[in-house]
């Protein structure tokens, strides 16, 4: 009868309205990084990459039948206690599926146990210490699209040897990151033998001078120094080296850590007086033009970025951009925002044509590292402070 038909119509309308509301509820992505740290560019670069990729995913219809992605930003100021508190808060957000971390390996290493206890995927797009991914927990909730120390240190050692430096010194940050790199160097040299490490010197963050440590390595017979440190510390070293006679300035081969801040500005004119190169996973200058142009078109729309030169800490942006797109594919394949289902889907992704490369696939159940040795390159700073392939 008419009354029953009316009830059915109302029920159908309510069902459609409920579905529409459900499809408009955002799927949230967390990012917790060192935004408030003085001179940081890494956290900001990661956020830009995420926002550009999210805008592209949403413009193409979002995920799960039209749900938009939404970024939730937190600032851990590079403090592990803040990062852990933020991770706990992220877990309580029912529509949040994954958290992207920042630059600092010691912070990420402290978050890893919490990520597994709470079963929330943790995405590494900068931090490079091996134990962030190699922690022995199963199933593994950490996925990395970034440099890894056990790839970084062999690349730096091989580069030194190719340049004719048969003896090198290691100047390392006195943290889990520095220790991860020493372990990687020792593993590599078990089979490679050369270059010979003449000495290892450790430095703490915020030292007033690194010259004594540098001189000890120079006096040990090193012909080049491999440096694992952050922007402010290495900038101090560069300024100190520039005061030495030219013949006492050894080449510096640096881990990517220096690129996550205002390194060129902190080093100043001294940078052009020191032979310094830095490890990278990607350069927009050598990227495939079609992929780069597509990215730059979105970057102009979303972030007002008009040129490659405006991208500070460019690898952070590229890593975050590609990993966000891979995460969106995983959400689609999982068919829900269930965190464990998304984690499982990340291990079974199809081939994806990203900005950095074509991932075939990015991850497997046995491999949670999206980048390999073939993706690494050395770069140098131009006089205007822009990083270009060496």
Question: What are the roles of these predicted feature ranges?
Answer:
Residues 1-2, 18:
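Intrinsically disordered, low-complexity regions enriched in serine, threonine, proline
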Residues 3-10, 22-390:
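Extracytosolic ligand-binding ectodomains
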Residues 13-21:
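Hydrophobic h-region of N-terminal signal peptides that target proteins for export
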């Amino acid at each position: 009868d008419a009354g029953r038909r009316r009830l059915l119509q109302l029920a159908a309308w309510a069902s459609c309205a409920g579905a529409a509301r459900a499809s408009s509820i955002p799927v949230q992505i967390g990012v917790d990084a060192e935004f408030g740290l003085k001179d940081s560019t890494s956290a900001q670069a990661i956020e830009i990459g995420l926002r550009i990729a999210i805008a592209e995913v949403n413009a193409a219809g979002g995920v799960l039948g039209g749900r938009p992605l939404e970024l939730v930003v937190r600032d851990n100021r590079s403090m592990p206690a803040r990062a852990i508190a933020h991770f706990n808060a992220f877990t309580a957000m029912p529509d949040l599926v994954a958290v992207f971390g920042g630059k600092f390996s010691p912070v990420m290493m402290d978050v890893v146990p919490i990520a597994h206890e709470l079963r929330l995927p943790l995405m590494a797009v900068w931090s490079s210490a091996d134990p962030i991914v190699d922690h022995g927990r199963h199933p593994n909730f950490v996925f990395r699209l970034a440099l890894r120390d056990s790839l970084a240190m062999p690349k730096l050692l091989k580069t030194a040897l190719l340049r004719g430096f048969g003896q090198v010194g290691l100047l390392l940050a006195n943290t889990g990151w520095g220790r991860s790199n020493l372990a990687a160097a020792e593993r590599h040299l078990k089979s490679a033998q050369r270059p010979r490490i003449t000495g290892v010197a450790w430095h703490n963050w915020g030292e007033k001078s690194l010259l004594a440590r540098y001189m000890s390595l120079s006096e040990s017979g090193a012909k080049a120094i491999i440096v694992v440190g952050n922007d402010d510390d290495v900038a101090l070293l560069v300024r100190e080296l520039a005061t030495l006679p030219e013949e006492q300035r050894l080449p510096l081969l640096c881990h990517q850590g220096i690129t996550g801040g205002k390194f060129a500005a902190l080093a100043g004119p001294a940078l052009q007086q020191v032979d310094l190169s830095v490890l990278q996973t990607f350069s927009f200058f050598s990227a495939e033009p079609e992929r780069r142009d597509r990215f730059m078109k979105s970057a102009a729309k979303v972030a007002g970025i008009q040129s490659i030169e405006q991208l500070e800490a460019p690898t952070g942006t590229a890593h975050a951009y590609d990993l966000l797109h891979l995460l969106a594919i995983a959400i689609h394949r999982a068919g829900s925002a269930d965190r464990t289902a998304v984690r499982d889907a990340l291990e079974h992704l199809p081939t994806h044509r990203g900005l950095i490369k074509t991932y075939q696939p990015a991850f497997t159940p046995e491999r949670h590292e999206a980048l390999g040795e073939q993706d690494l390159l050395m770069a140098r700073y131009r006089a205007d402070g822009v990083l270009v392939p060496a």
